[in-house]
Amino acid sequence: MSSAPNGRKNRPRTAGTIFQIGGKAPSRESERRESSEALLAVSDCRMVVQEFNTLVALYRELVISIGEISADCPSLRAEMHKTRTKGCEMARTAHQNLSAISGPEDGEIHPEICRLFIQLQCCLEMYLTEMLKSVCLLGSLQLHRKGKHYLGATKLDSRKEDSSDIPILEDTSSTPPDCPHTYFLVATDIENIERDMTEMKNLLSKLRETMPLPLKNQDDSSLLNLAPYPMVRQRKRRFFGLCCLVSS
């Protein structure tokens, strides 16, 4: 062992010092892993919200189609039921995913998560509006069909009272033979839509309760101007290509 110029002996580096320095690497690695997992969770949640957005737009188109017809269309009602069922499922999944990644209520929150919360809220509100429209249109279609059936029966009775010996042929082109069954099917659809509306209203209430604190403390106008934290008002920019437009 060599001696130092001042008479002290040089001691070799201990293994503890080496391991202590090397111990910081796993910490940085775990931070990178957590950050990557968080980004992946946000990306998955974004895809679910966009899928729900697309289903809301599709359901809206189907509701518009109801207003353009004057007779019952079983295939259209079946497509509406399929789209509505999947839409409710995607809404529940989106809410669960957002609640899982939102973090502590009073902590900092990524602006992308804020936008997803707002977009999901807007989509749910529009979804409820379109379901209410579909209930009104299906109900008016029922009344229209019943009115035509009643008028047809009245005309037939008045023609039967005629003393003429000419045989009367009943016009059944406008009234399907299974009217009572059709009434029952449409009424069942209306009940199912109202049930889904109740579920989505409850989900919307839960979403507003689980929103991060920065979103709860702002009014609707400031939510539309949401920007990266710290939240400040900026010029509105619209993102096109979606059913629910969210400004940032």
Swiss-Prot record:
Main subcellular location: nucleus
For the region Disordered, what residue ranges are annotated? 1-32
Can you locate the S-palmitoyl cysteine lipid attachment residues? 243-244
InterPro entries reported in the protein's UniProt record: RGS7BP/RGS9BP
Q: Where in the cell is it found?
A: Nucleus; Cytoplasm; Cell membrane
Q: How is it modified after translation?
A: Palmitoylated. Undergoes rapid palmitoylation turnover. Palmitoylation regulates the cell membrane and nuclear shuttling and the regulation of GPCR signaling. Upon depalmitoylation, it is targeted from the plasma membrane into the nucleus. GPCR signaling inhibits depalmitoylation and promotes localization to the plasma membrane.
One GO cellular component from the entry?
nucleus
Q: Which membrane topology term applies here?
A: Lipid-anchor
Entry keyword ATP-binding:
no
- Gene Ontology terms: biological process: G protein-coupled receptor signaling pathway; negative regulation of signal transduction
Q: Which UniProt keywords apply?
A: Cell membrane, Cytoplasm, Lipoprotein, Membrane, Nucleus, Palmitate, Signal transduction inhibitor
Q: Which PANTHER family match?
A: R-SEVEN BINDING PROTEIN (R7BP) HOMOLOG
**Similarity comment text for this entry:** Belongs to the RGS7BP/RGS9BP family.
This molecule's function is given as: Regulator of G protein-coupled receptor (GPCR) signaling. Regulatory subunit of the R7-Gbeta5 complexes that acts by controlling the subcellular location of the R7-Gbeta5 complexes. When palmitoylated, it targets the R7-Gbeta5 complexes to the plasma membrane, leading to inhibit G protein alpha subunits. When it is unpalmitoylated, the R7-Gbeta5 complexes undergo a nuclear/cytoplasmic shuttling.
- The protein's name is Regulator of G-protein signaling 7-binding protein A
Report the source organism.
Answer: Danio rerio
Q: Supply the gene name.
A: rgs7bpa
